[in-house]
Amino acid sequence: MEQQKKTAGKKAGSWSLLMGAAFLMATSAIGPGFLTQTATFTNTLAASFGFVILISIILDIFAQTNVWRIIAVSGKRGQEIANMVLPGLGYFIAILVVLGGLAFNIGNIGGAGLGLQVLFGITPETGALISAVIAILIFVIKEAGKAMDRFTQIAGFVMIILTVYVAATTAPPVGQAVANTFVPEHISIFAIVTLVGGTVGGYITFAGGHRLLDAGIKGKESIPQVTKSSVVGILITSVMRIALFLAVLGVVSKGLHIDESNPAASVFKLAAGNVGYKIFGLIMWSAAITSVIGAAYTSVSFFKTFSPKIEKNSRGIIIGFIVVSTLAFVTIGQPAKILVLVGSLNGLILPIALGTLLVAAYKKNIVGDYKHPLWLTSTGALVVIVMAVMGIYTLCTQLPQLWS
């Protein structure tokens, strides 16, 4: 009996950690950019955006399942695996991730400030400082990992419930949305790649994988749990994406005009008046603050293994990361050109990192006697090729803007 209780307790604890990793990944993906992109694409593609969401979900699952599985089996972080495949590559990926994480965190902290401005009428800078203090407090707590898991889960549920409520008030044409999801009137490759990059690109896909390692979940025996957790992470993101898509579609189908300078806020205001606008403020703050936490945690996890000192002081470095992003936003705002450059480079992280992990999956010195399924290798390779082509294309089109 005592043994059964212990086993049940262990299973519950393990499931809690797996859900924590899933929510950390999902809420890292659901940031200010996620809200804006979803509203903008729905406004332009209308019901056909359902097809874009469907394809991006499939590609996201292929990418994420590969990454988390190989990290768990090897028991090593992404940068360690990359260095074993090609010495020095891990450092290169780590630099890209940290630059991306820092630049996007300036945007995330700005989004959190904007959310509090909508809710309480304070300036975005004051809102950003308050949000930074809240994010820092999570890492000051002794059980920082558990606090982070719990916070991202609560924020995730709040965002989804509020967005579903607003979607219901707009009475979207669900039948039309379902029909267009499978037989679209318009297809946008750019929208698909943008969504995949925003959901599992950059540091985001490693957020949950590295969290599981920190919690001690690794080895071949953990594969079923890790796979389940990786898919749940994508599904949480997708539920939020679909709810927001339906909310925007409901507004668009009524012929109401969405303000292109702030599409997400405009949708909530048109859907539910001033109450809707306040709901947007809370969703924006939740989306931004969880992305601040996810970006800081994951970026630092990429440098942890390079030195025992970094490993020992990782919480202090995470706090420093949040402080630097906040000071950058408060003093210089969002540096547009830097964001363009880093955003372009960010598109290359997923194909480089995933490609490296797929090579690692066949190296005995990294994964032992583990056999990586062929269907995962081939689908992962497909994502690598698609995202590499689009990543290079984006880089070539965005870089000239820096000098214009």
Curated annotation (Swiss-Prot):
One GO biological process term is: manganese ion transport
Q: Does the keyword Membrane apply?
A: yes
Location of this chain's protein in the cell:
Cell membrane
The UniProt keyword set, sorted, is: Cell membrane, Membrane, Transmembrane, Transmembrane helix
One family from Pfam that matches here is: Nramp
Q: Which residues cross the membrane?
A: 15-35, 43-63, 84-104, 121-141, 154-174, 187-207, 231-251, 279-299, 316-336, 338-358, 373-393
Any GO molecular function:
cadmium ion transmembrane transporter activity
GO cellular component terms attached to this protein's record: plasma membrane
- Give the membrane topology, semicolon-separated if more than one: Multi-pass membrane protein
Question: What protein family is recorded?
Answer: Belongs to the NRAMP family.
Protein name per UniProt: Uncharacterized membrane protein YcsG
